[in-house]
């Protein structure tokens, strides 16, 4: 599906429709490939990936807002700032939000695939990103998000992905402007993939 089709009239919240659609696992993600980190000529290719000039880690404290239900999310949630932060990567359950769960046999939600309950918890993560045009593409890489997420760059929808324990990559170059940019990620606790990923989590 093209991004232009998703950018039709309606609030960002009203467009959050992919997490209950088994035919829409990914939107605007790059094709799957072997994982690698580019190293410049002269760099030690066996060094830690953090030493690559082509890698910029966005780990650290992100602005964070939590909602017990997706229904509680404001229509204009992209415009609402938060004074609270949370470390990334982490589990929000370890920071006073929601509650941990271990599922071994029973589903954590009422069995009604591909639908999930209305009280689907949502976490809104946001941070600034400084960009200088240098002719290089900017590929935003998520190394695992449970259970799905919607990505926004400068309040514009940039993509969607699920499959909790897999890498999702987005070419966000075309969404960036010179200077400061805002990255926002809306993470949902449950999606249609929960019916496949529920056990031993």
What is the role of each PLM region?
Residues 54-55, 77:
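Short secondary-structure boundary/capping segments within folded domains
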Residues 40-42:
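Carboxylate-rich, polar loop motifs that coordinate divalent cations or form catalytic acidic clusters
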Residues 55-65:
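Mature N-terminal segment immediately following signal peptide/propeptide cleavage
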Residues 87-89, 105, 171-172:
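Helix N-cap / beta->alpha transition motif
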Residues 95-100, 104-115:
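Surface-exposed, low-complexity/disordered Ser/Thr/Gly/Pro/Asn-rich loops and linkers
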């Amino acid at each position: 599906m093209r991004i232009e089709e998703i950018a039709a009239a309606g609030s960002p919240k009203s467009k959050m429709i992919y997490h209950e659609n088994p035919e829409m696992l990914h939107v605007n993600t790059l094709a799957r490939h072997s994982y690698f980190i580019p190293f410049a000529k002269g760099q030690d290719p066996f060094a830690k990936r953090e030493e690559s000039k082509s890698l910029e880690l966005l780990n650290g404290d992100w602005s964070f807002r939590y909602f017990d239900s997706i229904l509680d999310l404001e229509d204009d949630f992209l415009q609402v700032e938060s004074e609270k932060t949370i470390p990334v990567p982490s589990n929000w359950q370890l920071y006073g939000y929601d509650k941990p769960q271990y599922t071994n046999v029973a589903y954590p939600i009422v069995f009604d695939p591909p639908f999930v309950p209305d009280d689907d918890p949502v976490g809104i993560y946001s941070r600034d990103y400084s960009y200088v045009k240098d002719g290089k593409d900017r590929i935003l890489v998520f190394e695992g998000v449970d259970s799905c997420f919607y990505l926004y760059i400068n309040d514009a929808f940039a993509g969607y992905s699920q499959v909790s324990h897999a890498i999702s990559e987005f070419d966000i170059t075309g969404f960036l402007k010179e200077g400061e940019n805002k990255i926002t990620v809306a993470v949902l606790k449950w999606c249609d993939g929960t019916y496949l990923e529920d056990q031993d989590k």
